[in-house]
From Swiss-Prot:
Positions bound to FAD: 195, 214, 216, 222, 240-243, 595, 604-605, 607-612
Name the UniProt record assigns to this protein: Protein FLOWERING LOCUS D
Enzyme Commission code: 1.-.-.-
Lineage: Eukaryota, Viridiplantae, Streptophyta, Embryophyta, Tracheophyta
Source species, domain of life: Eukaryota
Gene field: FLD
Post-translational modification: Sumoylated at Lys-287, Lys-693 and Lys-770 by SIZ1. Sumoylation alters its activity and the histone H4 acetylation status of FLC locus, promoting FLC expression.
Length: 789
């Protein structure tokens, strides 16, 4: 495995959590584009080590299946490059993701089949990345993939296409794949932000009928590029999401390439200025930055010592405690610098350090996109407009109620009710926290709890269009210190967009507590304060600071369609809460997407985008399972035989197996109450024990039901429905099969029956599990797995 460090959010400006071990490797095709040394390729491949590791531990039996192969295949000589390219796309270099395991891409996790699948997967990704404006077909790989691995090719290709890792975006070849008419279920998407647009395009390509309801008069959500213009001077100002944080594998970088646009690298140079406008002494700057990072290191060690208790402690409390202990006589300038770094941290997390979880505030660091931080020339609105093209969006439709049930969904917006088979909710976490949308029935308590636990912070901006650039053109950012720690985030950082906006555009950021106070500050007062800072910096240098031609002050906290900026892990929360928020509800009727539903990429534009692709795949899978169930329900007698075949196939790779017991259940639904199917295999007749004490443990009910079968058959399989939690509890029963049978029938009170006795309820469960694992090529022969006694 290629290992990553877990760097902290320390970079000036929007934090760049660089992956040092990856960036130290050679990265081909990241050439500087002509015309400007700061413009870079929007996506690139990487090369590095690829270590193949076959899982074969003491608790796992690696199984080989006929027709798949018994040795590692060789596709080409670029396996190392392809592995690292897959790494930038979010895949482990030599193992499967949880999503792949749930999708059932290989017959068994571990072993030669998995290694070959990974090689094929990486090769397909690499092939598409060579020309991201093309549509890659499965037939393109028939000559390079050995025939005996055709099932793995099917599995890898289907997975990558369905989940949006290849063949996505706005290129013409991809647009051409949209069907002329929808032939599948109808889907309602609430919100036309990046996640909603990504899901809409993917679902439309799958053949679904899609309707997007957007409360605003525009698409994009928290990604908003405003055209500023005055006196024949214009500029494109990103008032919301503005920085592409990492370009290696970033799907939005791929969209930019499909648009034919290069990205502008944000330069690291960021000088700081004191309250009086004078530059901060470089030596003092370095000294305080080192000390600040040391405090973060101490806080990291502290949480390890505290364990779970650190969930209830804030990062701010830990930092302040260490600061007080480590320094007595702190100069005013040093204290101002320390507060500037706190403001920068609050900017990176859109939350006060006093509310960030010490335990998990940086839990997403290991998954950070590698590469530079970049601007898109012309603004990110270009991405939005391209993604919104030909998507049926109804604007100024504020959703009040979402009803979901077994018969479908109903979404109320104003006086109109929209009906569909499924609904995808992509509204920001702030809207969910506010209870702006009523869900009927109410959301599960675990989802309500995670909505409450997660933090949702605030970042505001002052965008200023000047008649000309008066600031230094050799930097893209500069910072300013404040005296009052309560206002440390007020205009603490300036971004120059002049190289990409089309005009002399400067944006001042307002973070932390200051961002909340800024919401009620009159715009004229805000602009006056900013100009006072700028003139204090530049006029002593003999540089005149002109009045801006146009200004815009954001109010994201007061926007009813966002009620904040982006999510963070607050005290009491964890990365698990992102996963819980992402869970579907109502047996595949209500789904959730958005930056607050990904634990890997929260608070990022690309995070929002990939969750839309993720949920499109989940919704398609759910619709497929529902279709299978309907066919079974319409003609149960005709489908009884096919369900028996499905059940036999599923039990060849059970989720749990111990003694004579095998259990299958959904791998996507972690709910302890979700259904599971148990199979008990009795291999020979059992003699009734005459000892009355022993008879108490011999499962009398089972024997009474099956005694006649024992006398006629050498082997019999009996079944029952139970919950996932009951299955897990049964596995923990000690004393062998007899004890488990007694626990099952006497303690749990379940009845073991033949296959036909399971009923149509079990048929529905079987169909759902089978549809969930579509793409898995099961062998025709039975194999034995790991067992415990």
């Amino acid at each position: 495995m290629v290992s990553f460090s877990a760097p902290k959010k320390r970079r000036r400006g929007r934090s760049q959590r660089s992956m040092s071990s990856l960036n130290s490797l050679p990265v081909p095709n990241v050439g500087l584009l002509p015309g400007n040394s700061n413009f870079v390729s929007s996506s690139a491949s990487s090369s590095g080590r690829f270590n193949v590791e076959v899982v074969n531990g003491s608790n796992q039996t690696v199984k080989s299946y006929p027709g798949i192969g018994d040795e590692i295949i060789t596709i080409n000589k670029e396996a190392t490059t392809e592995a690292l390219l897959a790494l930038t796309a979010g895949f482990p270099a030599d193992s499967l993701t949880e999503e792949e395991i749930e999708f059932g891409v290989v017959p068994i996790v571990g072993g030669i089949e998995q290694v070959n699948y990974i090689l094929i997967r990486n090769h397909i990704i690499s092939k598409w990345r060579e020309n991201i404006s093309s549509w890659v077909t499965k037939e393109m790989f028939l000559n390079s993939i050995p025939k005996h691995c055709s099932s793995l090719l099917d599995s890898a290709y289907n997975y990558l296409v369905t989940h949006g890792y290849i063949n996505f975006g706005i290129a013409q070849a991809i647009k051409d794949k949209f069907p002329a008419q929808s032939s599948k279920s109808s889907v309602i998407i609430v919100g036309a932000g990046l996640s909603g647009l990504a899901a809409a395009r993917q679902l439309m390509r799958f053949g679904f009928k899609v309707t997007v309801l957007e409360g605003r008069k525009r698409p994009g959500g928290r990604v908003y590029t405003k055209k500023m213009e005055a006196n024949r001077v214009g500029a494109a100002a990103d008032l919301g999401g503005s920085v592409l944080t990492g370009t290696l594998g970033n799907p939005l970088g791929i969209i930019a390439r499909q648009l034919g646009s290069s990205l502008y690298k944000v330069r690291d140079k960021c000088p700081l200025y004191r309250v009086d406008g004078k530059p901060v002494d470089p030596d003092v700057d370095i000294k305080v930055e080192v000390a600040f990072n040391q405090l973060l290191d101490k806080a990291s060690k502290l949480r390890q010592l505290m364990g779970d208790v650190s969930m209830d402690v804030s990062l701010g409390a830990a930092l302040e405690t260490f600061r007080q202990v480590s320094g007595n006589d702190v100069a005013t300038e040093e204290m101002g610098l320390f507060n500037w770094h706190l403001a920068n941290l609050e900017y990176a997390n859109a939350g006060l350090v006093s509310k960030l979880s010490l335990a998990f505030w940086d839990q997403d660091d290991p998954y950070d996109m590698g590469g530079d931080h970049c601007f898109l020339p012309g603004g990110n609105g270009r991405l939005v407009q391209a993604l919104a093209e030909n998507v049926p969006i109804l604007y100024e439709k504020t959703v009040q109620t979402i009803r979901y049930g077994s018969n479908g969904v109903k979404v109320t917006a104003g006086n109109q009710v929209y009906e569909g088979d499924m609904v995808l909710c992509t509204v920001p976490l702030g809207v969910l926290k506010n209870g702006s949308i009523k869900f009927v029935p109410e959301l599960p308590q675990r989802k309500l709890d995670c909505i409450k636990r997660l933090g949702f912070g605030l970042l505001n901006k002052v965008a200023m269009l000047f008649p000309y650039v008066f600031w230094s053109t050799d930097l893209d950012t500069f910072g300013h210190l404040t005296e009052d720690p309560n206002y440390r985030g007020e205009f603490f950082l300036f971004y120059s967009y002049a190289p990409v906006a089309g005009g002399a555009l400067l944006i001042a950021l307002v973070a932390g507590e200051a961002a909340h106070k800024f919401e009620t500050m009159p715009p004229t007062d805000a602009v006056t304060r900013v100009l006072h800072i700028l003139r204090g910096i530049y006029e002593p240098q003999g540089i005149n600071v002109p009045d801006p031609l146009q200004t815009v002050c954001t109010r994201w906290g007061g926007d009813p369609f966002s009620l904040g900026s982006y999510s963070n892990v607050a005290v009491g929360a964890s990365g698990d809460d992102y996963d819980i928020l992402a869970e579907s509800v109502g047996d595949g009727r209500l789904f959730f997407a958005g930056e607050a539903t990904t634990r890997r990429y929260p608070a990022t534009m690309h995070g929002a985008f990939v969750t839309g692709l993720r949920e499109a795949a989940n919704m398609a899978q759910s619709a497929k399972a529902r279709g299978i169930r309907k066919r079974i329900d319409r003609n149960p007698s005709r489908n009884a035989h096919s369900c028996a075949i499905l059940l036999a196939d599923l039990f060849r790779d059970p989720d749990l197996e111990f003694g004579s017991f095998c259990i299958i259940f959904s791998r996507r639904n972690p709910d302890p109450k979700s259904p599971a199917i148990l199979r008990v295999t009795l291999s020979e007749p059992r003699k009734r024990n005459e000892d009355p004490k022993a008879d108490q443990h011999s499962n009398k009910i089972l024997f009474q039901q099956l005694q006649s079968h024992f006398n006629q058959q050498q082997q019999i399989q009996v079944y029952t429905l139970l919950t996932r939690q009951q299955a897990l509890d049964l596995r923990e029963v000690r004393g062998g099969d007899e004890k488990r049978l007694y626990y099952l029938c006497e303690t749990l009170g379940v009845k073991l029956v033949g296959r036909k006795g399971l009923g149509v309820g079990a048929d529905s469960v079987i169909a759902s599990i089978k549809a969930e694992r579509t793409g898995r090529k099961l062998p025709s022969s039975s194999t034995s797995g790991t067992k415990s006694g």
